[in-house]
């Protein structure tokens, strides 16, 4: 039997306030950060262990075109999940058409919260993200995105992540049980990272992070934190969108540039093509600009 190498990542030395990507819309007094950038950097520096390209012709030709969903989770199922903090035991507390909500054993999530996650996922997050960033892969053959609710680091700090090293065996996004107030924004953001990584794992941060902020905005609208990101770049627009340095202005630049491309070059269909293009950075954007969607507006007008 083929054993796929898994690199779940390590958060033991991760400092969210320094290395984390702050989520849009979270309160200034209680910042909540994504650990995805840190985990992706670890994965890249390790040489992309276990890399799978689920939309490549070779991979698609190796699998049946029919989705059997034979390994789907059912409510009440128990299992073990690899996380960036080690393996945890989980129980499926809720399922929906496109998700299974797995809760770390010993953690208590109210049924009203679980119901809200499932309904918001199906009504808003899943359709919005897939419209702009493409359909999800199904490497684990369960036809579900695993929404894994675990204890990470208490209130604030790391709110969630997508671990690219785990993507070789399953489709999972992780949320800290102590940051559930921001769960929907976290899920919209991290699901974009999952979708983007499945098509173009080598993409530059300024495009991937811009798209992740775009996912949160398209799902839940504008707030003061989003305008703060945008204004940080607007007040110093000499900063290049392509020169990524992890500053607030960098996130604002990436977000606004992706929104500009969607507005000019064809909306969700255009962004889907950008995400699916394995060319990176400016080369992928040039490819899109030279062959935009029907009804696109010329850049510069």
Please tell me what each predicted stretch does.
Residues 95-215, 221-226, 233-243:
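Juxtacatalytic substrate-recognition/specificity segment
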Residues 86-105, 274-279:
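Short, compositionally biased low-complexity segments
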Residues 122, 205-208, 250-254, 267, ...:
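Active-site-proximal structural scaffolding
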Residues 7, 280-301:
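Beta/coil-rich, acidic/histidine-enriched accessory regions frequently appended to metallopeptidases
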Residues 1-91:
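N-terminal low-structure segments adjacent to metalloprotease catalytic domains
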Residues 218-239, 262-279:
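Short helix/loop segments within enzyme catalytic domains
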Residues 190-197, 212, 250-268:
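Alpha-helical scaffold elements that line and support the substrate/ligand-binding pocket
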């Amino acid at each position: 039997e083929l054993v796929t190498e898994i690199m779940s990542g390590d958060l033991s030395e991760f400092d969210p306030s320094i290395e984390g990507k702050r989520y849009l819309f979270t309160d200034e007094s209680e910042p909540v950060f994504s650990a995805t950038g840190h985990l992706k950097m670890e994965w890249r520096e390790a040489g992309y262990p276990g890399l799978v390209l689920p939309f490549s012709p070779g991979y698609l030709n190796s699998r049946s075109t029919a989705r059997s969903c034979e390994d789907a989770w059912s409510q009440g199922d128990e299992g073990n999940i690899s996380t960036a903090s080690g393996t945890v035991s989980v129980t499926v507390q809720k399922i929906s058409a496109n998700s299974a909500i797995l809760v770390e054993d010993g953690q208590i999530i109210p049924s009203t919260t679980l119901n809200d996650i499932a309904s918001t996922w199906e009504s808003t997050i899943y359709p919005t993200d897939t419209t702009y960033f493409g359909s999800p892969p199904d490497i684990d053959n369960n036809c579900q995105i695993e929404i894994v609710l675990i204890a990470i680091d208490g209130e604030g700090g790391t709110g969630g992540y997508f671990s690219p090293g785990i993507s070789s065996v399953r489709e999972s996004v992780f949320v800290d049980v102590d940051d559930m107030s921001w769960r929907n924004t976290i899920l919209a953001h991290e699901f974009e990272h999952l979708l983007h990584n499945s098509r173009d794992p080598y993409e530059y941060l300024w495009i991937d992070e811009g798209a992740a902020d775009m996912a949160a905005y398209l799902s839940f609208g504008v707030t003061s934190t989003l305008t703060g990101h945008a204004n940080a770049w607007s007040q110093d627009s000499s900063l290049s969108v392509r020169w990524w340095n992890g500053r607030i202005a960098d996130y604002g630049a990436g977000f606004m540039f992706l929104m500009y491309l969607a507005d000019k070059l064809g909306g969700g269909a255009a962004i889907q093509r950008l995400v699916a293009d394995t060319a990176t950075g400016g080369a992928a954007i040039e490819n899109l600009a030279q062959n935009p969607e029907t009804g696109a507006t010329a850049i510069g007008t």
